[in-house]
Amino acid sequence: MPESTPSLPDWLSRGMADLFPAGDPTDADQALAARLAQAEKEGRPLRVKLGIDPTGSNIHLGHSILFRKLRAFQDAGHTAVLIIGDFTARIGDPTGKCATRVQLSKEDVAANASTYLRQLGQDQPKETALLDFETPGRLEVRYNSEWLEGMDLPAVIGLLGTGTVGQMLAKDDFSKRYGSGTPIALHEFLYPLLQGYDSVAVNADVELGGTDQKFNVAMGRDLQRHFNKGTQFGLLLPILVGLDGVQKMSKSLGNVVGLEEDPLSMYSKLEKVGDGAINDYVTLLTDLDLATLPENPREKQKAMALAVTASRHGMEAAQKAQLDAASLVGGAGDAATEVPGASLAEVNFPAKAFYLLSAVGICASSSEARRQIKGGAVRLEGEKIGDPNQEFASAAELEGKVLQLGKKTFRRLTA
């Protein structure tokens, strides 16, 4: 009998937006499935690369979808190769940027890298860690300064010779900047080549990336071919929209959920995700089966929020957060109607958070309000207020919301 055509397992294809090599997607699926089967037959785990440039200090759920896929490969017995771009971070990825990025110092990059590894679970049990740091052979953490910092000028010139200016200008970000007359520094053309060379250095079988990284991932495949290495597959995942359900999740847009947020803040934010984004959140951030979830969007939100919070903090903490949100600050159910009211009639807007707390009588003074906010004791609708100077434009923005101090003081704000 002829052998059956191999197909990708569900854990791998879930949420996948694109797969290299280019051409018929079915062929790419079958080729990767065949490589998986061959690796299993040979007892050789695939080497799955994910590169991150530590240009900031915090990871949010939008970033986490790539790490979740990398963890899925680990759990299937393959080797995750996490590349910390400590060298490339000093150049800065030009993807999505309309101007040259500010270059970071070695010290800044090292500090950010340490923070990233902690957030990914370096010191956590693997049950709640994003990556498995515990199981031998499942994770390699590499720094691309290992092979890039020692490159001499002939090697750099040789690397530059593998690409063309036409290729670089075909990259959407460069094309837009060139067309608008915005300067493009020559070192920025190096970035895709250096990131691509990472795949050569670590002998990657698969590289993960967001759909905005298609050019860079393809460059890695091209360079592997140039250096006579086995060519990698490029597996691309979608860009997660933020809490507004419209724009991509981004700290600068204020629509993020951070990995280190406490359970109540995380749950409270997630259960307010727009209806149009719920299915993507379920698919990309959980292992839940959409077909088994309630059709009611509100119930689906709750199930998603519980699952995501549990994946970071454990089910017990997630269930407590769900109960706290429902009974104290969720705005639904009998308990919510028992929260005492606080009038905004005498509040002068725009109002800063510290002033608001004292104006509605939750804190005795502005100085106490500042202290409580800085201590992490203040929440609005379950979401922690961290900045005493956070500003609210009008009473309409706060109408009906619950302001919380500590574990026992709650006030529903009324205009």
UniProtKB/Swiss-Prot annotation:
Q: Which one GO biological process term can you cite for this protein?
A: tyrosyl-tRNA aminoacylation
Q: Which PROSITE patterns would you find in this protein's record?
A: S4
Give its E.C. classification number: 6.1.1.1
The main enzyme category here is ligase
Q: Which GO terms describe its molecular function?
A: ATP binding; RNA binding; tyrosine-tRNA ligase activity
Q: Which residues form a coiled coil?
A: none
Cellular component GO terms, alphabetical: cytosol
Q: Which UniProt keywords apply?
A: Aminoacyl-tRNA synthetase, ATP-binding, Cytoplasm, Ligase, Nucleotide-binding, Protein biosynthesis, RNA-binding
Q: What is its main location?
A: cytoplasm
Please write the reaction equations for the catalytic activity of this protein: tRNA(Tyr) + L-tyrosine + ATP = L-tyrosyl-tRNA(Tyr) + AMP + diphosphate + H(+)
Q: How does it assemble?
A: Homodimer.
Q: Which NCBIfam families match?
A: tyrS
Please give the name of this protein: Tyrosine--tRNA ligase
Q: Which gene encodes it?
A: tyrS
